[in-house]
């Protein structure tokens, strides 16, 4: 982010720059690592596709026409996610500064690894372009960017996620929430609506 971008996000949003050092990513194999800011999402996607010999169907189009990325946000209740991320440390969530001393707890890493493994097992680890955990916002959470590519190495958003109609899509999402609830159960997180 630029300095101007950070200042605006802190003014308007729920970011705390003094906790940015707590953010991390999960890399292939479930490895916890600092976020590689040198590789933006577009570059990660291009590298992933090139390494697998898959062409981006939106390449060369003036406007994208195909769903080539699925973005997930994983999280839970604010209170429980803060417990996982910060334990019993005193964090100032209101001033959005002065939290440089806060340490990231191993529980948030283990939770993220469990969610990563769920996504990898369900959709293929090779299709995960990024999995980033934010602990610098009011409610810690994970962002996952996934390529909807099937076993034939074809982009297949509708086949994988949507089904034939809205009812199929709704049922798929309800089922997905049920599956995630089983993963989150051990972390004291209950299924949302």
Each language-model region and where it sits:
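N-terminal nicking endonuclease/strand-transfer module with a His-rich metal-binding environment
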Residues: 1-193
């Amino acid at each position: 982010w630029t300095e101007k971008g950070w200042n605006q996000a802190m003014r308007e949003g729920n970011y705390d720059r003094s906790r940015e050092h707590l953010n991390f990513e999960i890399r292939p194999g479930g490895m916890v690592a600092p976020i590689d800011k040198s590789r933006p999402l577009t570059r990660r996607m291009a590298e992933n596709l090139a390494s697998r010999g898959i062409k981006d169907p939106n390449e060369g189009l003036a406007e994208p026409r195909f769903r080539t990325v699925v973005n997930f946000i994983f999280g839970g209740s604010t209170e429980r996610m803060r417990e996982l991320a910060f334990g019993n440390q005193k964090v100032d969530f209101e001033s959005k500064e002065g939290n440089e001393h806060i340490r990231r707890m191993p529980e948030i890493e283990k939770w993220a690894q469990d969610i990563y493994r769920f996504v990898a097992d369900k959709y293929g680890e090779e299709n995960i372009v990024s999995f980033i955990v934010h602990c610098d916002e009011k409610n810690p959470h994970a962002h996952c960017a996934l390529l909807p590519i099937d076993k034939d190495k074809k982009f297949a958003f509708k086949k994988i996620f949507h089904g034939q109609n809205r009812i199929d899509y709704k049922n798929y999402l309800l089922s997905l929430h049920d599956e995630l609830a089983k993963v989150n159960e051990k972390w004291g997180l209950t299924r949302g609506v």
